[in-house]
Amino acid sequence: MRVGGRPFYTPIHELPDVLDLHASFFQTFNDPERIGIIGICGWGGMAINAAAIDTRIKATAAMTMYDMTRVTANGYFDAEDSEQARFEKKKAMNAQRTVDYKNGAYALAGGVVDPLPEDAPQFVKDYYAYYKTPRGYHSRSLNSNGGWNVTSSLSFLNMPILQYSNEIRSAVLLVHGEKAHSRYFSETAYSKLTGDNKELLIIPGANHTDLYDQMDIIPFEKLNAFFTEYLR
């Protein structure tokens, strides 16, 4: 996201609205009755959220999804799910906003840790193997380099997504790796979905980042069949 040419290093919290705009502006090029979306990682959760509000979306696939609002508010595996823990996060981020204003620049939170500690959790090692190697490194990638700005996730603390995912009538396919640390996001999301056009597909042996780029693991045939069926 850029304003006046200077990057904010912040996620677009209104991503579901952006997806809805695409559904509108692409109608001159595509069939408005056959709109499908795919979201990966954090955008997977946002894609489901978009499907909850935009009835033009007929099929949604979320790959190795994150619920960014949940992990921000509760920490990984909900280990920080308390009012006090959230208060401390708010306090720290709001204090940083004042510092950023005084400095005239955003402090960055840091991307994937480098060098990688020997005792790093396996999912951090998996991220390193993607973002810090030719697999996924890019000079402008925030995760590969300085990361998002420290205060960028503040609104996520106060804006839980997926609140009305149980009302999605269109088709949803959730795909997650068996060994992914983030698997619980898809499992929770699936438990809230209703209707026989919803599916959770667990890929045996796969971790979180395998579904980013591993061509022999990503279930392309399943994705093709899913969109073919529901975008007819």
Predicted regions and their residues:
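Alpha/beta-hydrolase-fold catalytic nucleophile elbow
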Residues: 38-40, 61-64, 203-204
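Alpha/beta-hydrolase-fold enzymes
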Residues: 48-130
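Active-site nucleophile elbow and catalytic-triad environment of alpha/beta-hydrolase enzymes
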Residues: 69, 75-76, 146-164
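Short beta-strand/loop motif that positions the catalytic acidic residue
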Residues: 168, 174-176
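Conserved loop-alpha-helix segment in the C-terminal half of the alpha/beta-hydrolase fold
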Residues: 178-199
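Catalytic histidine-centered segment of alpha/beta-hydrolase-like enzymes
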Residues: 206-217
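Catalytic nucleophile-loop/oxyanion-hole region of alpha/beta-hydrolase
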Residues: 1-36, 217-219
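Glycine-rich nucleophile elbow surrounding the catalytic serine of serine-hydrolase chemistry
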Residues: 39-49
